[in-house]
């Protein structure tokens, strides 16, 4: 028999991943004082400032490229590479800011879901629904986190491979960096080179962990909400008991269901408040980033093609997973109205003893007919249809860019 899943196991891995960039454990209580919050987030603040400088340095470098102050034979390709890297860093910066700014909301959501997870009245059927929903999500978020770590490792250590290859072929060391960032000093001089290289390597880790940490937190929270919606639908369908001739137990279940449904609506509103703006930026930028990657894949050599393809796949996986879990909330909230109607309230003695029982179901049915939809800044519903729209937009941008360049 499979061991029951513990609540802390659902967030445990991603909490440890986020601690790599100094983010306090999302499973820990929210600090009550400003001093304690600042102390627990000191490492995260340092990482945020490091990534902020990387964005600043890359923007300056793009400006130098476009003004012709940097010598290169392929200006368009270099600018595309820089824009892709800078865009990804800006998204990571926005997600890190969102995690920090909304830490109180995150703590409240996790505490609320923990109480519901450990509720004593859950049956074996309820626990089966609970574990069956969350186990795949934990596995998916783990794979997504590892995939992003592999991607950033490829970016971080590709220059090392190129330098070794150049040494073997030409007999000379040519100092390279993972990313092209402007510094107000000679970054290739002596020991400074190694310090700058380490700075860029860790900055790559910061942006990857910031991105995937935000995404995984979103997926886990939405999966918890989807699971609660599945439980609610199951309770609604089993609400009416045939043996309950006076309808006492059925009425108690109905009142519990109404309160539970209201709690889930508040949870959905908290998720919307926490993720809406950042996901709008993410979806908007991803269309441009995927366009850039498609262009670079068609123009780059074999070595760079592998790197750009890996980057492209990570972006695709990220957007698909976000939209998939948004779709899950839409689908499970839509089933509530059908569950209320299928509870057989009209065939039982409950409706005969208490004619108002059926009328009390009307608000649940009406609310269920307005499904919960998470949106990216009230512009994009977070659904599979939006994922398809982003792909179509990216392809349109790519074909336009190819036409202009040729």
Swiss-Prot record:
Other remarks on this protein: Expressed at much higher levels in mosquito strains that preferentially bite human compared to 'ancestral' strains that prefer to bite non-human animals.
Superkingdom field: Eukaryota
Membrane disposition: Multi-pass membrane protein
Keyword field contains Glycoprotein: no
GO molecular function: odorant binding; olfactory receptor activity
Subcellular location: Membrane
Stretches that traverse the bilayer: 44-64, 79-99, 137-157, 168-188, 277-297, 302-322, 371-391
Record topological domains on the Extracellular side: 65-78, 158-167, 298-301, 392-406
Family: Belongs to the heteromeric odorant receptor channel (TC 1.A.69) family.
Function of the protein: Odorant receptor that specifically recognizes the human odorant sulcatone (6-methylhept-5-en-2-onesul), a volatile odorant emitted at uniquely high levels in humans, thereby playing a key role in mosquito's preference in biting human compared to other animals.
Gene from which this protein is expressed: GPROR4
Protein name: Odorant receptor 4
GO CC, alphabetical: plasma membrane
Effect of residue 406 to R: In allele C and allele G
InterPro entries: 7tm6_olfct_rcpt (IPR004117)
S-S pairs: none
Primary residence: membrane
Sorted UniProt keywords: Membrane, Olfaction, Receptor, Sensory transduction, Transducer, Transmembrane, Transmembrane helix
GO biological process, one term: signal transduction
Result, substituting residue 331 to V: In allele C, allele D, allele E and allele F
Chain ranges on the Cytoplasmic side, renumbered to this chain: 1-43, 100-136, 189-276, 323-370
């Amino acid at each position: 028999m499979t061991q029951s899943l513990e609540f802390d196991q659902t967030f445990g891995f991603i909490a440890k991943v986020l601690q790599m960039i100094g983010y306090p454990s999302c499973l820990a209580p929210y600090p009550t004082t400003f001093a304690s919050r600042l102390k627990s987030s000191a490492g995260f603040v340092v990482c945020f400032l490091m990534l902020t400088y990387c964005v600043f340095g890359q923007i300056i470098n793009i400006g130098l490229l476009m003004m012709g102050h940097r010598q290169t034979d392929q200006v368009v390709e270099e600018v595309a590479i820089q824009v892709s890297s800078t865009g990804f860093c800006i998204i990571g910066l926005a997600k890190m800011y969102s995690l920090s700014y909304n830490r109180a909301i995150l703590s409240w959501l996790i505490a609320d879901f923990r109480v519901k997870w450990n509720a004593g009245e859950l049956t074996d059927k309820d626990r089966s629904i609970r574990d069956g929903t969350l186990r795949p999500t934990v596995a998916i978020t783990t794979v997504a986190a590892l995939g992003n770590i592999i991607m950033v490792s490829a970016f971080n250590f590709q220059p090392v491979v190129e330098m070794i290859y150049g040494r073997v072929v030409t007999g000379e060391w040519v100092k390279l960096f993972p990313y092209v960032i402007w510094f107000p000093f000679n970054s290739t001089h002596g020991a400074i080179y190694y310090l700058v290289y380490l700075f860029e390597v860790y900055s790559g880790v910061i942006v990857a962990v910031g991105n995937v940490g935000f995404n995984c937190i979103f997926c886990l929270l939405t999966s918890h909400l989807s699971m609660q919606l599945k439980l609610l639908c199951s309770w609604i369908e089993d609400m009416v008991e045939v043996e309950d001739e006076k309808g006492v137990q059925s009425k108690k279940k109905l009142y519990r269901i109404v309160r539970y449904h209201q709690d889930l609506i508040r949870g959905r509103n908290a998720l919307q408040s926490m993720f809406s703006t950042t996901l709008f930026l993410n979806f908007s930028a991803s269309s441009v980033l995927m366009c850039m990657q498609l262009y670079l894949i068609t123009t780059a050599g074999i070595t760079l093609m592998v790197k750009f393809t890996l980057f492209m796949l990570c972006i695709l996986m990220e957007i698909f997973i976000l939209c998939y879990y948004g779709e899950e909330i839409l689908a499970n909230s839509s089933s509530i109205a059908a569950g209320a109607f299928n509870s057989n309230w009209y065939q039982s003695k409950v409706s005969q003893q208490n004619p108002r029982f059926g009328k009390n179901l009307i608000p649940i049915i009406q609310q269920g007919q307005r499904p919960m939809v998470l949106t990216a800044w009230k512009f994009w519903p977070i659904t599979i249809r939006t994922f398809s729209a982003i792909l179509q937009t990216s392809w349109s941008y790519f074909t336009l860019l190819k036409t202009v360049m040729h």
